[in-house]
């Protein structure tokens, strides 16, 4: 991942507006709702991380886990169009795999 001021951190409720806006831009006809993103933050069976660059959310991942199994599903992986082809998606995926 390139960039000196980028970090991948667990999503917080303060990120919801930015994530919801990015989701709507990326998937205008099938966007995940703000309510669902809030549930992912609160859920013990979800990992929701955001990629932040200079205090701006530029990407995120959501991984959902099935109860009582070793199964996980990458539910969402988004990088802002203006930040693609810089390794950010790869970094988000690596974090999701951890």
Residue spans of the language-model regions?
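Acetyl-CoA-dependent GNAT
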Residues: 3-6, 10-84, 90-95
């Amino acid at each position: 991942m390139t960039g000196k001021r980028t970090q991948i951190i667990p999503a917080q409720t303060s990120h919801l507006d930015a994530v919801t806006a990015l989701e709507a831009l990326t998937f205008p006809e099938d966007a995940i709702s703000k309510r669902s993103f809030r549930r992912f933050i609160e859920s013990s069976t979800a990992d929701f991380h955001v990629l932040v660059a200079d205090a701006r959310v530029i990407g995120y991942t959501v991984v959902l886990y099935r109860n009582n199994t070793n199964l996980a599903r990458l539910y969402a992986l988004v990088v802002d169009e203006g930040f693609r082809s810089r390794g950010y998606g790869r970094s988000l995926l690596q974090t999701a795999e951890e």
